[in-house]
Amino acid sequence: MNIWIFNHHALTPDMSGGTRHYDFAKELVKRGHSVTIVASSFHYSKYKEIKEYHNNEYLQETVNGVNFIWIKTPPYFGNGISRVKNMLSYTYKVLNIIPKLHLKDPDIIIGSSVHLFAVYAAHKLSKEYNTPFVMEVRDIWPQTLIDMGMSKWHPFIILLGWLEKYLYNKADKIISNLPYAFDHIGKFVSKDKFIWISNGVDLDNINYIEKIETDKFTISYTGAIGVANNLTLLVDAAEKLKEKKDIFFRIVGDGAEKLKLKELVKLKKLKNISIEDPVAKNEVSNILQSSDILYFNLKDSPVFNFGISSNKLFDYMAAGRVIIFSTKAKNNPIKDADAGYTIEPDNLKQLEQTILDIYSLQQSDRNKIGKKIRKYVEKTYSMCVLSDKLEKVLEDEVRKYNA
C-alpha cells in the first residue's frame, strides 16, 4: 500500500515528543509499504521552528525509509488566536501544495487530530485521489476544550462540533488511541466503524538493562511540563525528602510551567532536584535506564474520562523501572501489568511515602517489578504488535473500497 498520513504535529526521533506515526510508518515500510507523513515543523511545545525553509513553503526528506513533507506554518505561543492561524495555515497549504507535488497516488489516506482541520484536509484529498479516508482521533475536540473550560456556545466550539460530526460521518474507518473514545464517538457512529489502536513503544529504542544499585537513588520525570502535569508536587516531594542525601529528583522536558518550576526550586534552595532541557526521543532511554523510579502524573480532570494513551508511559514501561502512576484516568496500564505503584494525583503525603517504600526495597525486588512491567509492554504495547493491527485495518479498508 501507498499510505499518506496527515498529522500537523508529527515528529521524527531526533526531536523531543511523541513519534506515533513515524514508529508505525517505520514498521509498515519494513513490511513493504510506502508511507508519507505530512506535518508542520513548528514544534508544538518548544514553540519554535525546527527546519530551515529559506524561500520555500515546504521541504521533503526521507527518514529511515519514511517520507516526510514538512509544511511551513506561522509561529505561535500558547493557545490563542495565533495557534488557530497556525492550524488554518497548515490546512490551506496542505490542500494547495500536495496536489502540485505529483506524488504517486495513495491507496489510503489517514487524517489525524489533535485539530480537526488537518483531518478535514485529509478528507478533501481522499476525495480528490479517490481513496478510502481513515480518521484518527487522538484528542476528542471539541469535548476536550469544553472540559478544559471553554464555553460550549463559543463560536469556535460550535464550528468544531459541526466539523467533528461531519468527519465522523465521512470517514470510512475511525481509529482512536484512547481506550474509551467510543463512549463519545459512539454517539455518532456504529461500533463496526471504530477501532482502538493504542500508542506504544518502539522496543528497539529502549533496551531493557537491569538496574545496578548506585550511590544515588533517582526519581525521574520526562516530557511536557504543563499545568496538567502538576510537577510542583514533585518539587514539594524533593523538599520533603531533602534530608535523604542519596535521593535525587530529575525533571527533563519543556513547557509553559518550566520557568515557574525553576523559580520554585531556587526559592526553596533545593540541591536535590534538577530541571533540565528536553532531549531527542532517541536519547530518552539513557535517562530512563539511569533512574530508580519513573514518575507519571496528571491532574485529576474530566479530560481523561476517555482514558489515556501516553507515549511517555509506554517508554517508562519499556525501560523496566519501578513506576509511580499518579492519575485518575479511566484506564491504568500499570495496574493492568500488576506491577508498579498507583497513587492519588495531587497527594503529596502519599507520593512521599511511596517513594520511601520503594527506596526501602532491595535492588533485586525493584528489578523484579521492572521486569514484570517490561514483559507486559512487550506483549501488549510494542509498535510491532500494534502495527499488525493497523496494517490489517488499512488493508481491509483498501480491499472494501476497491471491491
Residue spans for each PLM region:
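Carbohydrate-associated surface elements
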Residues: 180, 197-200
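A charged, aromatic-enriched C-terminal amphipathic alpha-helix characteristic of glycosyltransferases
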Residues: 346, 363-396
